[in-house]
């Protein structure tokens, strides 16, 4: 079969979910375990949650993003903290006072988790569900406005 070129199949693109799994496994310490646990809580809270991988650039390998009718939160890992930033956190009720970072902004709020710090899983799940409800209400409102 001389002279015949067999096309190579395109490499399979890595999914956002596999990138997030890989990211949690890259850290061989509490940070990876913490991000993996919070991810599981997010996914358990909403079976329709979408996982995305955004903001890849030469200085940043990308950021895990969880979305449902819009961004719910991002998960970032730093040297001393795992940070979950809620896109519309300033509009969410937080009776358990989980938000402890980015408190001065008008839109976002974040939860910084340090080594050894426990997370109130029920309160965290409630925040995720509130964020989804806010996104869904905003989407519904904008759909009605567009139809008018």
What are these regions (language model features)?
Residues 1-148:
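Charge-dense, helix-prone N-terminal extensions
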């Amino acid at each position: 079969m001389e002279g015949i070129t067999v096309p190579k199949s395109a490499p399979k693109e890595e999914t956002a979910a596999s990138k997030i799994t890989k990211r949690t496994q890259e850290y061989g310490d509490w940070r990876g375990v913490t991000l993996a646990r919070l991810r599981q809580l997010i996914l358990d809270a909403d079976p329709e949650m979408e996982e995305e991988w955004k903001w890849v650039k030469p200085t940043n390998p990308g950021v895990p993003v969880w979305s449902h009718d819009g961004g719910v939160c991002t998960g970032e890992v730093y040297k001393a903290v795992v940070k979950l930033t809620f896109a519309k956190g300033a509009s969410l009720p937080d009776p358990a006072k989980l938000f402890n970072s980015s408190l001065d902004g008008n839109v976002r709020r974040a939860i910084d988790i340090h080594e050894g710090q426990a997370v109130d899983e029920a309160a965290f799940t409630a925040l995720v569900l509130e964020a989804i409800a806010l996104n869904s209400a905003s989407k519904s409102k904008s759909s009605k406005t567009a139809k008018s």
